[in-house]
Design a protein with these regions (language model features):
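Gly/Ser/Thr-rich loops at beta-strand to alpha-helix junctions
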Residues: 78-82, 203-214, 266-274, 311-313, ...
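Extended, charge-enriched "interface" segments that sit outside catalytic cores
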Residues: 49-195, 558, 594-598
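N-terminal small/polar loop signature for handling phosphorylated ligands or for N-terminal nucleophile
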Residues: 170-192, 197, 242-257, 264, ...
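Acidic, Ser/Thr-rich peripheral helices and adjacent loops at domain boundaries
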Residues: 478-513
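Short, Lys/Arg-enriched N-terminal segments with co-localized hydrophobic residues
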Residues: 31-43
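Anionic-ligand anchoring segments at beta-strand to alpha-helix junctions in alpha/beta enzyme folds, i.e.
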Residues: 197-257, 279, 401, 405-441
Length: 615
């Protein structure tokens, strides 16, 4: 009786879907013609929570949670359903990306509701606004154009952006040409250090998007045949944390005579970055003084370069303005890996040629995202599923599980891309959201994660997961006498884990297997844990660019659906302000033994304890 009643609830949601499709748009939801122009010029649409699809999806989600017949073990037994929940993207040369989301807790009808909701909130128009350079980052009055960084020379961007398209793309390629020329001089030995030694060590100083994205790409290419060959004899390291331990570990075995420091800061005022830059400057000057070089100005000019927009502060630091590589206000930090922020240090390590292939891969997905129909669009599908899991199924976390050790820093980068973008409390026009946006992202490469946090995923909280695997290994190994290659062993787990999460193992299964009664409940796997599987051909520079762009655009899609601004980050400001107050107190107390003033009792007590400590 209960199941029948629950089924009626579910089918009422599907009935509502049919009613929505049959009814005129102006009778159920604000028509497209009612969309208005935001004061900054971006197109706004109705909020997702104001659409009838939102209500229908809430109803469907409640039923999905309650109805045993909608358990994934039953949904996945429907071959037709599973075949309909797969998307394929193929590029020249036979490269494939297969996205299988049949193990998500969705049906064809639920996906139709999601597509219809996307239509009502103007997803396509918002996507086009981004493509054409409208100022969709309205709180900062900026366009969002990281996709332009990947456009090849000769691309006719003026078709999309008649007013500024050609100028913007010309500027992008002027910087890229400058990077290529400088990198060629360093890698060929034409640009040497002050002692005449070639510069083979690269210390990249930056934090947040200036570090996480480039570091992900560095690690992803480390075992690639072409990239590793190009990197022979060179090493790139990232210095982000202001903790002096990070600086010590980064530089302790480097020769300053062979080291080039890359300082990355848009404003050249980022507190942590500039303190590390000054520390590196002193390290270079002191280290080279020990080798008989005393011209500090010449040391800085030959051993320090900058990625910044603040030429006056860069030159004041002592850096040759010809060794400054710019970018633009329309490049957000977490989306900047394809700008000089990432391309300068990564080209020094792997060559400009390899990084051009990376940019080509990202551009390939940009074109797919902007052109492909929504139902075949990989970032759109991932974004809609993310909205379903977060907003309707109320799952607050997402695991990123790349079955490739090369992607060990990928989850950390996407953690910033997604959480800094979509962790917002109000819509783009300042209205509090009626639900929580964003997800808590975390992950580790498989199979390492299986021996760490998968226990919770299988028998604890429900955590939607993205499995990412590759048909080819960067370093194939096949040992004589083993039944499978090392890569096949890895991929065996890639294919098995989503099924284990979806199907689980029941009490009756355990009884049939003869498991002792006292252990049966401990060994039950409830299953019904959602995941998507993305299988790509190979992880080279092009493939890494594809993967990056898929997840960047996935994040934007979710923000578009939620009607939030995914491209600002006001949430990072308050802590900076408070840290400035603490910094001032520490300075005063260290110099004059002044007592702690102006803080709450808890912080005051901790500060007093910190200041009173004697080594």
């Amino acid at each position: 009786m209960k199941l029948r009643r629950e089924a009626l609830v579910f089918f009422s949601a599907i009935s509502l879907l049919k009613d929505i499709k049959a009814s005129s748009s102006d009778s159920l939801v604000t028509d497209y013609s009612s969309r208005y122009q935001h004061s900054k010029g971006t197109t706004m649409s109705v909020k997702c929570s104001d659409t009838p699809q939102f209500l229908a999806l809430q109803t469907a989600a409640e039923q999905m949670k309650m109805d045993e017949k909608l358990h994934l073990k039953h949904l996945c037994s429907d071959a037709a359903r599973c075949a309909g929940l797969v998307a394929n993207h193929e590029t020249e040369g036979g490269r494939k990306i297969i996205l299988d989301y049949s193990r998500q807790q969705v049906t064809g009808e639920i996906m139709e509701l999601l597509f219809d909701m996307a239509d009502k909130v103007g997803l396509v128009d918002k996507r086009n606004d981004m493509r054409c350079g409208k100022k969709i980052n309205s709180t900062e009055g900026r366009a969002v154009l990281h996709h332009v960084l990947r456009m090849p020379k000769g691309y006719d961007y003026s078709v999309r952006n008649p007013a500024e398209g050609k100028k913007i793309l010309d500027e992008v390629h002027a910087v890229r040409d400058k990077i290529e020329a400088f990198v060629s001089k360093v890698r060929s030995g034409e640009h040497k250090g002050v002692t005449g030694k070639e510069l083979k060590n690269f210390v990249c100083i930056g934090i947040g998007g200036s570090q996480l994205g480039p570091e992900f790409v560095l690690e992803a290419l480390r075992a690639d045949a072409k990239a590793s060959q190009a990197a022979m004899g060179r090493q790139l390291r990232f210095l982000a944390n202001v903790d002096p331990v990070d600086f010590n570990v980064c530089t302790r075995d480097l020769d300053p005579a062979e080291t080039l420091v890359v300082v990355i800061s848009k404003t050249f005022t980022t507190a942590e970055t500039m303190l590390n830059a000054r520390t590196a400057k002193k390290w270079l000057i002191d280290g080279l003084a020990d080798q008989g070089i005393v011209d500090a100005d010449d040391i800085v000019k030959k051993h320090v370069i900058a990625v910044s927009t603040a030429e006056d502060l860069v030159t004041e630091f002592g850096i040759d303005k010809n060794n400054m590589f710019g970018f633009w206000e329309w490049v957000g930090g977490r989306f900047s890996v394809c700008s000089a922020v990432g391309i300068v240090p990564l080209s020094l390590q792997y060559s400009y040629e390899v990084m051009s292939e990376f940019l080509d891969g990202a551009h390939c997905i940009d074109e797919h995202f902007f052109e492909a129909p929504l139902r075949e669009n990989l970032p759109v599908l991932l974004g809609l599923i993310g909205v379903w899991n977060s907003t309707f199924m109320c799952y607050g976390t997402r695991a990123l599980l790349p079955y490739s050790q090369a992607l060990k820093r990928f989850p950390a980068h996407i953690q910033q891309v997604d959480m800094e973008s979509n962790g917002k409390r109000v819509t783009i026009d300042g209205v509090p959201l009626p639900f929580q946006s964003g997800e808590v992202d975390f992950g580790e490469p498989g199979t390492n994660g299986q021996h760490s946090f998968y226990q919770l995923m299988h028998q604890g909280r429900v955590v939607p997961a993205d499995f990412i695997g590759f048909m080819e290994s960067q370093t194939p190994v096949e040992l004589q006498g083993e039944i499978v290659s090392n890569h096949d062993e890895l991929m065996s787990n890639f294919f098995a884990q989503p099924d284990a999460l979806a199907y689980g193992k029941s009490l009756s299964d355990l009884i049939q297997e003869g498991v002792p009664e006292n252990l049966r409940e401990h060994k039950v796997f409830m299953g019904n844990r959602p995941s998507s599987s993305m299988l790509m051909t190979k992880l080279d520079a092009f493939g890494i660019g594809q993967l990056l762009a898929i997840y960047e655009h996935r994040t934007a899609v979710q923000g578009f659906i939620w009607s939030i601004n995914s491209f600002d980050q006001w949430g990072v400001e308050l802590g900076k302000v408070l840290a400035k107050q603490v910094r001032s107190q520490l300075n005063t107390s260290r110099k004059s033994q002044a007592s702690v003033q102006g803080f709450n009792s808890s912080t005051s007590a901790l500060l007093e304890a910190y200041l009173s400590h004697k080594k």
